[in-house]
């Protein structure tokens, strides 16, 4: 594998000196989500209590209060302003009492730190001002880890500010896109599909691995600096895992996920790691040093929760997996029924975090979110329905 650009499989950890100025906090007051994750290696019958929940993209366009902020500021302007980002991050907690606050940011912020202008266009998505067709294009970007991390200071400031505003009430989630998902966005070249990304992989296999290695080192350092800023839990989003075959996924994603996870765990062993792999599966995920596996509604229906628990020998927490489209419907009672059906499919409720199968949609109804939460709150996670 090529190691040009000075990147290889060795650790290259950079911690911002400014991190030492952050206030250090202890364990959050509401630690139900952390206690569930800590139950990963315990017997399945251990009683935890309520089922914890949070919602992917829980601070977003479905919230009226967020849309008021958006009248004044763009998405990127909010991300770049630690005070605004913190304010938006807390909105869902104030409204719904979520068991974890997600810092308001985006997986593509890394590209901005690498020297790419990024904008989000409604109904289109992210637009990058630079296109990557070959290695020469990539080498023009800023790939120096120290510079990239320092350029993302506002993410780390926002995490620490949010922790203070919350009085350390609940855990904070930091996150990153997987190296593979970042690669696909980087080489998508603003097209609707990922044909350019796949073409790049087939045409420039060695260069693909070089780029993935660079992105892995940036991801590792971004996660470690989020943890040092106050994140209790981190999630890795492999949101584009479904665009490649099982074997390609193993080569171009799992290898780099393992690298990121192992190095983060080695350097910050107390952090909990959630992995979200969208609609792809390879049995080698069982060898990843993760605490939580976040699944989609499709994965829950196709494989069942028992399959995933058994794959990890019951030493895993499952997260998910309501279809986000259910929160668009006009009947709260139906939302509750679908949520109950989902909960019935989770065999070990004391090894479970309730969530959606993917990010909440912009047109989701607030009442439906309440119905989703109320249904979850009505179920205890004491005993499995069946031994999986």
Region spans (language model):
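Alpha/beta enzyme core
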Residues: 188-234, 239, 246, 250-272, ...
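Short, well-ordered coil/turn segments that N-cap beta-strands
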Residues: 44-51, 96-100, 166-172, 230-232, ...
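Catalytic-face loop-and-helix region of soluble metabolic enzyme cores
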Residues: 262-386
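N-terminal basic, low-complexity leaders that serve as flexible interaction/assembly modules and, when applicable
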Residues: 4-122, 259, 344, 366-385
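Conserved, mostly hydrophobic/aromatic
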Residues: 52, 93, 162, 219, ...
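Active-site-proximal, glycine-rich beta->alpha crossover segments in alpha/beta enzymes
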Residues: 119-222
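Alpha-helix-loop-beta-strand connector modules within alpha/beta enzyme cores
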Residues: 151-170, 246-271, 312-315, 372-381
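Glycine-rich, proline-tolerant flexible connector loops at the mouths of alpha/beta enzymes
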Residues: 102-122, 128-132, 138-148, 230-250, ...
């Amino acid at each position: 594998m090529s190691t040009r650009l000075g990147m290889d499989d060795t650790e290259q950890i950079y911690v911002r000196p400014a991190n030492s100025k952050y206030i250090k906090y202890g364990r959050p007051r509401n630690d139900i989500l952390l206690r569930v994750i800590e139950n990963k290696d315990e017997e399945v019958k251990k009683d935890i209590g309520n089922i914890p929940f949070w919602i992917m993209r829980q601070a977003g366009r479905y919230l009226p209060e967020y849309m008021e902020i958006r009248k004044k500021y763009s998405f990127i302007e909010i991300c770049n302003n630690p005070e605004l980002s913190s304010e938006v991050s807390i909105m869902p907690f104030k409204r719904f009492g979520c068991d974890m606050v997600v810092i308001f940011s985006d997986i593509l912020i890394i590209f901005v730190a690498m020297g790419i202008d990024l904008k989000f266009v409604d109904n289109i998505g992210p637009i990058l001002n630079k296109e990557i067709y070959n290695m020469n294009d990539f080498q023009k970007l800023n790939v120096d880890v120290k510079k990239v991390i320092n350029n993302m200071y506002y993410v780390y400031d926002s995490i620490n500010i949010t922790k203070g505003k919350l009085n350390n009430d609940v855990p904070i989630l930091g996150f990153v896109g997987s190296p593979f998902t970042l690669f696909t966005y980087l080489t998508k070249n603003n097209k609707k599909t990922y044909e350019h990304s796949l073409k790049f992989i087939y045409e420039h296999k060695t260069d693909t691995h070089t780029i993935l290695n660079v992105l892995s080192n940036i991801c590792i350092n971004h996660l470690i600096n989020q943890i040092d800023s106050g994140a209790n839990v981190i999630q890795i989003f492999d949101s584009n895992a479904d665009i490649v075959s099982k074997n390609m996924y193993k080569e171009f994603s799992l290898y780099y996920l393992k690298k990121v996870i192992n190095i983060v765990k080695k350097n910050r062993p107390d952090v909990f790691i959630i992995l979200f792999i969208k609609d792809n599966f390879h049995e080698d995920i069982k060898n990843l040093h993760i605490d939580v596996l976040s699944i989609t509604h499709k994965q829950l229906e196709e494989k069942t929760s028992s399959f995933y628990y058994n794959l990890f020998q019951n030493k895993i927490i499952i997260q998910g997996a309501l279809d986000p489209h259910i929160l668009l419907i006009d009947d709260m009672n139906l939302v509750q029924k679908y949520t109950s059906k989902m909960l019935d499919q989770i065999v070990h409720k004391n090894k479970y975090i309730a969530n959606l199968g993917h990010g909440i949609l912009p047109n989701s109804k607030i009442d439906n979110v309440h119905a989703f939460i109320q249904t979850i709150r009505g179920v205890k996670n004491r005993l499995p329905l069946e031994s999986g």
